[in-house]
Every structure is written in structure tokens, then in C-alpha cells.
Amino acid sequence: GVVIHYVGNPGTTARANRNYFESLSAGTDEVYASSHFIVGPEGEVIACVPLTEVAYASNSRNDDTVSIEVCHPDETGEFSQVTYDRAVELTAWLCEEFHLDPEEDVIRHYDVTGKLCPLYYVEHPEAWDAFLQDVAAAQEAL
């Protein structure tokens, strides 16, 4: 499956979030966090962890999911249009690549742990439903 996250630190870049994850690999803290992909504020996508490896992002679902972190401009956690569009494209590509059904196999971090992530799409379930519909349409277009 695919798990969608938000970075939780408004206004930051994909590179800054990647660098944060990379700094954790030094192992000086007891913090383990990573993601397969980060979608940045300009729609850029940074691949952080190979798809053949586990990213530490979704607790009990780390072993069977691909994680996507999405940057957001403000405290609401709503993705900008460019990041939304790129997250839809990336998620659709992953669904096609791994023969996944967006309605069943794309989930929020919240759906695994109860954490309010991605915040806007937990607080606005209709926006989450629209995201899944957009992913399904994008997958069909591939």
C-alpha cells in the first residue's frame, strides 16, 4: 500500500526534510524516521529510501507500504495545488507499478496510528475522498 503523510513543519522544503531524515541516520538519538519520497513546495519529488527497502514512517505498516511525505505551506496542513497534483501523480504511479487499488490501498498515516497526519485530510475527510478519486483517475490515465 501507500501511506500519505504531511511533514508537519509548515513552509519547509523537500530538501530540508530529507536532510532531517538523513541526520537521523547518524544514530545519535533514539529517533527513527524516514520516508520513501518527499513532495516539495514546488512539486519536486525527492526519493529518499529505495522502494526495495523499509522506510520508518508508518509503525506497523512499514514493511508493506511506501511512504510519501508532502510539504505544506501553513499550519492547516492543506497541500498547495502544485504539491497536491504531484502527490496525486506519484501515488497513481505507485498504484500502477504495484497493482494497487487507490480506494483500498492508499491510506493516511492516521489510518495506521491515529496520529493527525496528514492533518488537513484527517480533519476534512471529504478532501481525502477527493484525493483518492483523483489518484484513481490519474492511474486510469497512465
Where is each model-derived feature located?
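Basic/polar, cationic surfaces and motifs that engage anionic cell-wall
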Residues: 73-142
